[in-house]
Each structure stands twice: as structure tokens, then as C-alpha cells.
């Protein structure tokens, strides 16, 4: 492994020991990595771990003094100050340092034994309501120790010059071959290997056997330990929808009932957890706290809510990096879970998702690597309704980022209501080896599909909504498409306006749940075949597409399709603290702008469209005046019904 992006070793280790009470995860942290934000925050995860129900992380901070070309901060801190720092973080540091390689091995072995003994004592004596102080090791060695001391009269060992490739041997530098050979011979290979180049038997005997070998530890190949979740029938958690739009429900709140019972059904297995940066209640997962608590091993006060030394929710550390890192460690060691986040702030872990996608890509080519549970994201508190928050909280770009990853790895779902959300979540939490992204509403919203129809719709991934379409048996004049909860409402409202004004106008209404259905089947396994796509979207009719995110993403996904008469409305990077409907108006996703745009491409209407066009423009002016005076949306917007 060439290393690369740093900062997550400790959070991975802490995720690995969750619900693994007999596991000790020794985690080597380079002093360069220790300077990253995520790693610096990770030292405090010892306040989350419960030594009665979880394993123990043994950090080994390796101070070799240098990064690529600079000294490291931790190596230039006086030792007494360094020890105080880690004691302040709740650790008991042991410093290991020696001037000879033989001595360092002896000291390190002795210190490891001492740390293991200390961990065993902690495990045996810890009481439920008292946080323990865990051991850690600070290992000091010169950078490049054992390598060439000088090259071209410049010191290498013990300096930044020993980073990565200290000796370049190629046709431009043949003189360095002797230096390289001397370095390799310093390890005395003749004492290690026989004449056939095989490791000597007496040395082989020293190596651990079976699962005691690092690479054979089942925790390093988590699929070996994976147990399927006990999942209740999700159909029993749907909301009743007799007629589209009549029922009002909060999608994330209702999903919480389903997740609550997954927690209850797997309490004995202890293999399912929820991760999020202090947002479980904000994202309306309230009902999970009927079954569990937030895990917290720090000081607790009487007015704390849902805080306990043991709980299935990791929600008490305000760091997307740490929540994502712990979830990845939890999944990689054979368990299940998901991370939920404000949509805008999941961008903080963009690159972490990329690294996990790369890992999944490589593992697909390794037959010995067993399947693990998918990395599941739920994005809520999203761009279209921020209440007291504003422009800083508005960014749907995680979807653009995820789409760039390998097609056999990523999936994106935009359920328009409660029943489709529950169906999507059930699918994602059962899946393996994917990165699944669900974008979900948390506010009270109209409900469109009963559970039976929701299952069919999610299974297909997209489809024509009969109740909103009137093109039975003929080609439509207009395709009104949408993806996302808010765009669905506005697209339906626009459709209603058009149909009320032009009864002979044929509109086909299409809702997209699985965003990857829009891509060509050549590019993504979920993509529709061209014939299917053309049958649904037509080859040439105008398409008004109301989209949750940035409009360019829809154009990117559909650029190979025959019908390029596509006009996408989505987030245009306009926003502030304002009303819900005004957010849509500012970004031209509202019903009036959708109608105005549709009229441009409906040639059959001729001059008849002028009056409606003017009416919509006047409505937009009326809207601005109303919210300026009353600070809320017009009654006809707030009380709109299908």
C-alpha cells in the first residue's frame, strides 16, 4: 500500500473494536498523520468506547521526526510536554526509545507486554460508570533507521531525505547501485535464507500460526465474520395513502420506527450501529431512542438526554470524519450500519468515500476477500428547507462526487415520500459491497404512493405516475420528470397548473428514485436500455426535469440518450435564510418557473400560452411581495393540494 490520504487509522481502529470486547487493535500512527485534523480529533474517541462491551485500541505513535520535507510537530515538542498532552487526552503514554536496533526490539516487546497486562486489568476491573485511562506507546526512532547514512555527502538516515525512495537507482544514476546493494546486504540475507532462497526453518518456526498471523486474523477480512441482520418486514412500517397527496407524513421520522426495530431484533448479535455527527434528533431519527441510547463514556449530567455508557448510536462526537471512519472500521470488521448527515456537510468526507470506493474496486478482483456490508449514507436536512439555517447549509454536490466512482460500486436513491424511503433503506441495508446514498426529507410532506405501489416503483427505479399523467394511449406533448422529494411536489404543482389551463395538453409525469437509471446501460448496470428509455422519455418531446441537485448532473447522466430536448431545473447556488418556497423560486425550481419553461417548448399552444406565462410571472412578483410583508409563504403555496 502506497499510503496516500492520511488521518483515519485511529477512527478505523475504534470502529473495529466496537462490540468486540475481546479485541485489541494495535494502531500505528505516523507523526505526519498525527498532524491531520481527523487524527488529532481521534485521540478523544476513548471517551466513546466502553471497555465492558467493546475492545481496546492501543495506539502506537511513531515519532521518526520528519514528513516529506519538513520536521513533524510532535517530534519537536519536549517529551514532558508531549506526555502531558496525551495524559490530558485521557491516555497513559509509554515512551520507547533506544540507540541500537537490538535494544529497541527488547524495549518494545517489554512495553507491549506491559500494555497488554494493563489492558487486561482495565477490562477486568472497569465498572459501568467509570471511564478508564488506556495505555498508548510513543515510539521514537530515527527516520530511515538502518538505511544509508549518507548519499552524495548528504545525511539521509535521521533526516527528511530518507522519506519514500531515498536511493534512486536507474540508468541516470548507476553509481547508486553499490549503495543500494550495501544497504540490502546489511540485513545479512545469508543468515535468513538457505541456498534456494527459502526462509530458514528455525526462523519460520518463530512466526505465528493460523489465525494468529496478521493477514489471517478474521477481523482483517470482515466478511468472514459477517452475520446477516434480522430485519422486520418493512411493509409493516409504511404510512397509509388512500389518495395521492392526502396523507401528510415526515419521511425520516417514520423511517425511525423501522430502524428502531432493527436495533431491537439485533440486540443479541450486536452487529448494527448508527453513526452521525450530533444529528440523530435533528435528522428526525427520534424513535430509535425508544430502543437504545447514544454511547458516551465521559462525564454525564442529569439533564443529558439519551446518553449512556452503552448504546447503538454513535452520535456524541461532532466530526463527520470520525463518524465515517468508525463506520468504515465497523463495516470492515464484518458488521452493519449507516451514517446520516446534513446534506451539505457530508462533503467533509468526500475523499473518505473516494478511498472506500477505491478499496471496494480492488477487492472485487480478490477472490479471497469476502463481501462486507455496504457503506450507506442518508443525507437529510437538505438544501431545499433549512428553517433557521441558510446558504452555508446548502450544497447537494455529494451526488456529483459519488457519480464519478465505478458504476459497479455506487448507487444513488432519491425517494419522494415515506414509503419509497423505507423501501430504499431496506434494500440498501441488506446490500453488500456498495456505496449507497439516500437523500431523504425530514419535514412534514404530502405522501404519494401506498406501500404496494412504492415497492413496485422502487424496484423499477423510475416510472410514469398514472395519477399525474394524461397521455394514455398516445405520445405526450410534454414529459414532466422529477427526482427528489421537493422537485416532485413542484413538478406535480406545475403539471396541475398546465392541465387546468390546457385540458387537451398531454403530459407524461415521470418520477426517478434510482438516479443511475438515467445513465446508459453501457455505463451503469442499473441504466435503462435505450429502447426502454426512449419508450418512457420519448425520442424528441420536450422534457422539463425538476432535480434535487445541480442541473449539470442530469445532463451528464443523459448525454448519450437520443432525446436531448432536456431542460433541467435544480440548485443554482442561490440561497439564504428564507422561506421554503422562496428557496425554490431563487433557484427556478418552483412550479411557476417550471410552467414558464415548459411553455417555451409547447409549440402547439401558440399564442394561447401568453396569458398563462404572464400569470406565472405575476405570481412570482406576488410571492416576493408577500414574503417581504409577512415572512412566510402565501397560503395557496402552504395549503396546496394535488
Model-derived regions: residue spans:
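Thiamine diphosphate
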Residues: 1-26, 35, 41-450, ...
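Gly/Ser/Thr-rich loops at beta-strand to alpha-helix junctions
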Residues: 33-35, 142-145, 278-282, 319-320, ...
Amino acid at each position: 500500500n502506497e499510503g496516500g490520504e492520511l488521518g483515519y487509522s485511529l477512527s478505523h481502529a475504534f470502529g473495529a473494536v466496537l462490540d468486540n470486547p475481546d479485541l485489541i487493535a494495535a494502531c500505528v500512527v505516523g507523526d505526519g498523520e498525527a498532524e491531520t485534523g481527523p487524527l488529532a480529533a481521534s485521540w478523544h474517541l476513548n471517551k466513546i468506547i466502553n471497555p465492558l462491551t467493546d475492545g481496546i485500541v492501543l495506539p502506537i505513535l511513531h515519532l521518526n521526526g520528519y514528513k516529506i520535507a519538513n520536521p513533524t510537530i510532535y517530534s519537536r515538542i519536549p517529551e514532558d510536554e508531549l506526555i502531558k498532552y496525551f495524559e490530558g487526552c485521557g491516555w497513559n503514554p509509554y515512551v520507547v526509545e533506544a540507540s541500537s536496533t537490538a535494544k529497541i526490539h527488547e524495549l518494545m516487546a517489554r512495553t507491549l507486554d506491559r500494555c497488554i497486562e494493563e489492558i487486561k486489568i482495565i477490562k477486568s476491573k472497569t465498572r459501568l460508570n467509570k471511564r478508564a485511562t488506556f495505555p498508548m506507546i510513543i515510539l521514537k526512532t530515527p527516520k530511515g533507521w538502518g538505511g544509508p547514512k549518507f548519499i552524495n555527502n548528504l545525511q539521509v538516515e535521521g533526516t527528511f531525505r530518507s522519506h519514500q525512495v531515498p536511493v534512486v537507482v536507474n540508468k541516470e544514476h548507476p553509481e547508486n547501485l553499490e549503495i543500494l546493494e550495501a544497504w540490502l546486504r546489511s540485513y545479512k540475507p545469508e543468515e535468513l535464507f538457505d541456498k534456494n532462497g527459502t526462509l530458514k526453518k528455525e526462523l519460520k518456526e518463530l512466526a505465528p500460526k493460523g489465525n494468529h498471523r496478521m493477514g489471517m486474523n478474521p477481523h482483517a477480512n470482515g466478511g468472514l465474520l459477517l452475520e446477516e441482520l434480522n430485519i422486520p418486514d418493512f411493509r409493516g412500517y409504511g404510512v397509509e395513502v388512500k389518495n395521492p397527496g392526502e396523507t401528510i407524513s415526515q419521511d425520516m421520522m417514520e423511517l425511525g420506527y423501522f430502524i428502531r426495530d432493527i436495533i431491537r431484533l439485533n440486540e443479541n448479535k450486536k452487529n448494527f450501529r448508527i453513526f452521525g455527527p450530533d444529528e440523530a434528533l435533528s435528522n428526525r431519527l427520534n424513535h430509535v431512542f425508544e430502543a437504545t441510547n447514544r454511547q458516551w463514556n465521559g462525564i454525564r449530567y442529569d439533564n443529558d438526554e439519551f446518553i449512556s455508557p452503552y448504546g447503538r448510536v454513535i452520535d456524541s462526537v461532532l466530526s463527520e470524519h470520525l463518524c465515517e471512519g468508525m463506520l468504515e472500521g465497523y463495516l470492515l470488521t464484518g458488521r452493519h450500519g449507516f451514517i446520516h448527515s446534513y446534506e451539505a456537510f457530508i462533503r467533509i468526507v468526500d475523499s473518505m468515500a473516494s478511498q472506500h470506493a477505491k478499496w471496494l474496486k480492488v477487492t472485487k478482483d480478490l477472490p479471497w476477500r469476502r463481501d462486507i456490508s455496504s457503506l450507506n449514507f442518508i443525507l437529510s436536512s437538505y438544501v431545499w428547507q433549512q428553517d433557521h439555517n441558510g446558504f452555508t447549509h446548502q450544497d447537494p454536490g455529494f451526488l456529483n462526487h459519488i457519480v464519478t466512482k465505478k458504476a459497479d460500486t455506487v448507487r444513488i436513491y432519491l425517494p419522494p415520500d415515506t414509503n419509497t424511503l423505507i423501501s430504499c433503506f431496506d434494500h440498501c441495508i441488506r446490500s453488500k459491497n456498495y456505496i449507497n446514498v439516500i437523500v431523504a426529507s425530514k419535514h412534514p410532506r404530502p405522501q404519494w404512493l401506498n406501500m404496494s405501489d412504492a415497492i413496485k416503483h422502487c424496484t423499477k427505479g423510475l416510472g410514469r405516475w398514472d395519477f399525474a399523467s394524461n397521455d394514455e394511449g398516445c405520445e405526450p406533448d410534454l414529459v414532466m420528470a422529477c427526482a427528489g422529494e421537493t422537485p416532485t411536489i413542484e413538478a406535480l404543482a406545475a403539471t396541475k397548473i398546465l392541465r387546468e389551463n390546457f385540458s387537451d395538453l398531454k403530459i407524461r409525469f415521470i418520477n426517478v428514485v434510482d438516479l443511475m437509471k438515467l445513465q446508459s446501460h453501457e455505463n451503469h448496470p442499473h441504466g435503462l436500455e435505450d429502447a426502454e428509455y426512449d419508450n418512457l422519455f420519448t425520442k424528441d418531446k420536450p422534457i422539463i426535469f425538476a432535480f434535487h441537485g445541480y442541473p449539470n448532473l442530469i445532463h451528464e447522466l443523459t448525454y448519450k440518450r437520443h432525446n436531448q430536448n432536456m431542460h433541467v431545473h435544480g440548485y443554482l447556488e442561490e440561497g439564504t435564510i428564507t422561506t421554503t418556497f422562496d428557496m425554490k423560486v431563487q433557484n427556478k425550481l418552483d412550479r411557476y418557473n417550471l410552467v414558464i419553461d415548459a411553455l417555451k417548448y409547447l409549440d402547439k399552444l401558440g399564442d394561447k400560452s401568453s396569458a398563462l406565462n404572464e400569470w406565472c410571472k405575476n405570481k412570482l412578483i406576488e410571492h416576493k411581495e408577500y414574503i417581504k410583508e409577512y415572512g412566510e409563504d402565501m397560503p395557496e403555496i402552504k395549503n396546496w393540494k394535488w
